[in-house]
Structures are given as structure tokens and as C-alpha cells.
């Protein structure tokens, strides 16, 4: 593993343990060149997935894009990092277990929307405002009203 401090090619693993959500291995490493210590995370990748964007453009699936989007939507919200990691890991597992080599970005966006809906309603609305391209305050109002109606419907037992 290349050292992030001096770019030396070799490092030694000093400690390995599963992450808190058991979806990755956390490794403490020490650079053989400069002696600096750093942490890496190793995740299982079930299959290579290609994301089909609008306009039929294709790019490799990148977990960090979902992490960044979810983190931005949840910024300054009472949602801890562990919950965010669980959400992103769950979405990644869903994508990889679909069995398809390609997945539409729209499908991923809907998975993120559903995950955020269950996690935090404000984060859900924030993400939706970008994902669904809200252009006016009325768009926010209408969406927020529908979210509130869903919440009331779920609390009342779906009646």
C-alpha cells in the first residue's frame, strides 16, 4: 500500500480488525520508508458495476459519490457517522447483489432517497431538492407536504 505521506510503495500492517458495522476491515499500517502510521479500510467488492448516467454515459460505480451526497444531505443533522456508513454500505450491497453489470444512476438515486427517508426527513428533503432539481420554493413546499403526509400515514398505521 502506497504511503499517503511520502508515496513509498511498501507498508507493514500493524493491526487489523473489523469495522463497527462489519462491512470492512480496518487496518493500521506503518510506512517502511518514513515510518508514518495511517489507517486503511478494505471492503469486499462482489462485482464490478458500471453506472449508466443520463445520456447513456457510463462510469464505474464509486461508493465515495454516495458517501459525499449522503454526508452533504445530513450535514448539521443529528445523524452519526455510523448510521451514514450503514446506509451507504446497504445501498452498495443492494447494487452489487442485483446481479446486473450495469445499473442506472436513477436507480441508485431512488435507493439513496429511500434510505434517507427512513433516516432523517430533513436530509431526505435536502437530497430530493438536488436529485429532483427543485427550482422554486413551491417545489420544496409541495415535497415537504408529501413527506409530512407520509409520516402521518405511517404513524397512523396506514389507514
UniProtKB/Swiss-Prot annotation:
Metal-binding keyword on record: yes
Ranges in a coiled coil: none
InterPro entries: ATP-cone_dom, NrdR-like_N, RNR_NrdR-like
Free-text comment on the cofactor: Binds 1 zinc ion.
Residue span(s) of domain ATP-cone: 49-139
GO molecular function, one term: zinc ion binding
Membrane spanning stretches: none
S-S bridge residues: none
Single GO biological process annotation from the record: negative regulation of DNA-templated transcription
Keywords, comma-separated and alphabetical: ATP-binding, DNA-binding, Metal-binding, Nucleotide-binding, Repressor, Transcription, Transcription regulation, Zinc, Zinc-finger
ZnF unnamed: positions: 3-34
Region of interest (Disordered), ranges: 1-26
Domain of life, per lineage: Bacteria
Cofactor annotation: Zn(2+)
Biased composition (Basic and acidic residues): 11-24
A Pfam family it matches: ATP-cone
Function: Negatively regulates transcription of bacterial ribonucleotide reductase nrd genes and operons by binding to NrdR-boxes.
NCBIfam families according to UniProt: transcriptional regulator NrdR
Listed PANTHER family: TRANSCRIPTIONAL REPRESSOR NRDR (PTHR30455:SF2)
Family affiliation: Belongs to the NrdR family.
Name recorded for this polypeptide: Transcriptional repressor NrdR
Organism per entry: Novosphingobium aromaticivorans (strain ATCC 700278 / DSM 12444 / CCUG 56034 / CIP 105152 / NBRC 16084 / F199)
